[in-house]
A protein has these predicted regions:
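Catalytic-site neighborhood detector that most strongly recognizes the C-terminal catalytic loop/helix
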Residues: 27, 133-158
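A short, basic/aromatic helix-end/turn motif that makes direct DNA contacts
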Residues: 8-14, 130-136, 146
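C-terminal secondary-structure termini that scaffold catalytic or DNA-interacting sites
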Residues: 13, 18, 29-31, 36-47, ...
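Short, basic (Lys/Arg/His-rich) helix/loop patches that form interaction surfaces
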Residues: 50, 66-74, 79-84, 88-135, ...
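Gram-positive cell-envelope targeting signals
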Residues: 3-8, 90, 106, 110, ...
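Short, charged phosphate-coordinating catalytic segments
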Residues: 1-27
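Residue-level detector of conserved, well-ordered beta-strand and adjacent loop positions
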Residues: 24, 53, 77-79, 146
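Short, cationic motifs built from Arg/Lys/His that form the positively charged side of catalytic pockets
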Residues: 1-3, 48-49, 63, 112
Length: 167
C-alpha cells in the first residue's frame, strides 16, 4: 500500500473477519499545504482489497484496540498535533529510526518496493501483485520490477528443467 493509503485507513476499512483491507481513500495535501483525507486513491485501480497477512494481523488488531477518537475517525492519527498524518511526517520518522539503527534510509516508499520484491521472489504471480499494489496494468508492475524478474531467470530455467525431467 502507498503511505497515503495507510494513513487514510478508517476502522471499517480493516476487515479482520474476511482478512482484507479495503483501500478506499488516501491522504492528499491542499493548496494551503495541509493534509486532508481524500475519498478515492491515486488511480482508479488503487481502489482495491489487499489481503491481511498473518504477520500483519496482530499489529492491525493492536492499532484498532488503541485507537482514540479523532475528527476523521482514522486508524492512524497525530493526537499530539491533532492532525492527519502526512507522508512527510512518516518519512521524517522513518529516517530517524534508520539513523538511530545506523542503517541507510531510502525513504518509506522503499518499504513498498521491498515488499513487492519479496513477493516476486516468493513466487507470487505478477498479476496478483499488480492488484495488491494498485497498478493500472501489468506492464507497470513488470517494468518497475524488471531487475527482480531478470535475477530470477536462472531459477526459472532450473524449475523448467526439473519439470521436463519428470514428464
Amino acid at each position: 500500500m502507498r503511505m497515503g493509503e495507510i494513513n487514510a485507513l478508517h476502522p471499517e476499512d480493516i476487515d479482520l473477519k474476511n482478512g482484507v483491507i479495503h483501500v478506499r481513500s488516501t491522504i492528499s495535501r491542499g493548496f494551503d499545504y495541509r493534509a486532508y483525507v481524500k475519498e478515492g486513491t491515486k488511480t482508479y485501480n488503487g481502489l482495491r482489497d489487499v489481503p491481511i497477512s498473518k504477520k500483519l494481523r496482530p499489529y492491525l488488531e493492536e492499532a484498532l484496540e488503541r485507537k482514540e477518537e479523532d475528527p476523521f475517525n482514522l486508524v492512524f492519527y497525530d493526537y499530539i498535533n491533532d492532525s492527519v498524518i502526512n507522508t512527510n511526517q512518516v518519512n521524517c520518522y522513518f529516517q530517524r529510526i534508520c539513523s538511530d539503527a545506523e542503517i541507510p534510509s531510502h525513504g518509506q516508499h522503499s518499504l513498498r518496493h521491498t515488499f513487492a520484491t519479496r513477493c516476486i521472489e516468493s513466487g507470487i504471480p505478477p498479476v496478483v501483485l499488480k492488484t495488491w499494489l494498485g497498478h493500472k496494468d501489468i506492464h507497470t508492475t513488470l517494468d518497475t520490477y524488471t531487475d527482480v524478474f531478470k535475477k530470477m531467470d536462472q531459477s526459472a530455467v532450473d524449475k523448467f528443467d526439473t519439470y521436463i525431467e519428470q514428464v
